[in-house]
Amino acid sequence: MSHQETWHETLHDHFGQYFTVDNLLYRDTTGQQDLVIFENAALGRVMALDGVVQTTERDEFIYHEMMAHVPLIAHGGAKKVLIIGGGDGGMLREVSRHPGVEQITMVEIDAGVVTFCKQYLPRHNAGAFDDPRFKLVIADGVNFVSQSSEKFDVIISDCTDPIGPGESLFTSNFYQDCARCLNEGGIFVAQNGVCFLQQDEVVNSHRKLGHYFSDISFYQAAVPTYYGGIMTFAWASQNPALRQLDTATLAARIDETALTCRYYNAAIHHGSFALPQYLLNALSASR
């Protein structure tokens, strides 16, 4: 790619987005995936895997804040957190902002993603890879949870879309193993695509999670990079009360954590579980 060449995302047929490549920083096959990192005047540094944008400097905070703080604040006392994926370090950065968390394990299938993101996307991790609570495991997340005897309070599946290496992170076996690896009162959350364009993905996750969790829902956030509507996150636990905390309780926990965010707050947390009617209809029809 040369200066001002355009890069086109290939996630959806017949519809997509493009970026101008103002400065190509890296492109290669890591051994697992095709990785490209470039600079764009509108969104800063952009990372894509296998033709799909994973993160940009400009708006990554929305995604990472919502994936990390919604389950951690709702739990209210998480000590051990498992991140599946998350090689760019953004999820680790947000989880590490919770002083009550004592152990953060991140399982990333591709060591190359971690290495290159440390070099080319340093703002994402903001030094969190050096946190003494952090442990990096280079392994397949599916295999890790299937073989693990550890228990966690929160599991965050910061997965790619269900294509390539990320496909196995949307299977019934993976969800079953995650449920087994949670402590009592634990919460599982996962990236679940843009529901307007990827509704089947949400419906399938809802159906599969229902076999292993008694409370399944979804929450949403507006992340500009993930075009086509509102970003959807799966939520699963055995306790519906964790999903129904009022804004006063959420605000008190946020204050106690001394958490200051750019997107996430108590009202956003509470309101993010309100879903559009077309998605509610689809979920109801799938039961």
Swiss-Prot record:
Catalytic reactions on record? S-adenosyl 3-(methylsulfanyl)propylamine + putrescine = S-methyl-5'-thioadenosine + spermidine + H(+)
PANTHER family per the UniProt record, alphabetical: SPERMIDINE SYNTHASE, SPERMIDINE/SPERMINE SYNTHASE
Question: Which PROSITE patterns does the record cross-reference, listed alphabetically?
Answer: PABS_1 (PS01330), PABS_2 (PS51006)
Cite the binding residues for S-methyl-5'-thioadenosine: Q33, E108, D140, G141, P165
Report the NCBIfam families cross-referenced here.
MFS_SpdSyn, PRK00811.1, speE
Spell out the protein name for this chain.
Polyamine aminopropyltransferase
Gene3D superfamilies tied to this protein = Spermidine synthase, tetramerisation domain, Vaccinia Virus protein VP39
Per the Swiss-Prot or TrEMBL record, the active site comprises D158 (proton acceptor)
Q: Which gene encodes it?
A: speE
Please describe what this protein does: Catalyzes the irreversible transfer of a propylamine group from the amino donor S-adenosylmethioninamine (decarboxy-AdoMet) to putrescine (1,4-diaminobutane) to yield spermidine.
Subcellular location(s) per record:
Cytoplasm
This protein's assembly is summarised as: Homodimer or homotetramer.
| Keywords for this protein | Cytoplasm, Polyamine biosynthesis, Spermidine biosynthesis, Transferase
**Per the UniProt entry, what species is this protein from, by scientific name?**
Sodalis glossinidius (strain morsitans)
Ligand binding (spermidine)? H64, D88, D158, C159, T160, D161
The similarity annotation says:
Belongs to the spermidine/spermine synthase family.
Q: What is its EC number?
A: 2.5.1.16
Q: Which GO terms describe its molecular function?
A: spermidine synthase activity
Query: Which SUPFAM superfamilies does this UniProt record tie to the protein?
Result: S-adenosyl-L-methionine-dependent methyltransferases (SSF53335)
Q: What biological-process terms (Gene Ontology) are attached?
A: spermidine biosynthetic process
Give Gene Ontology CC terms: cytosol
Name all PABS domain ranges.
5-238
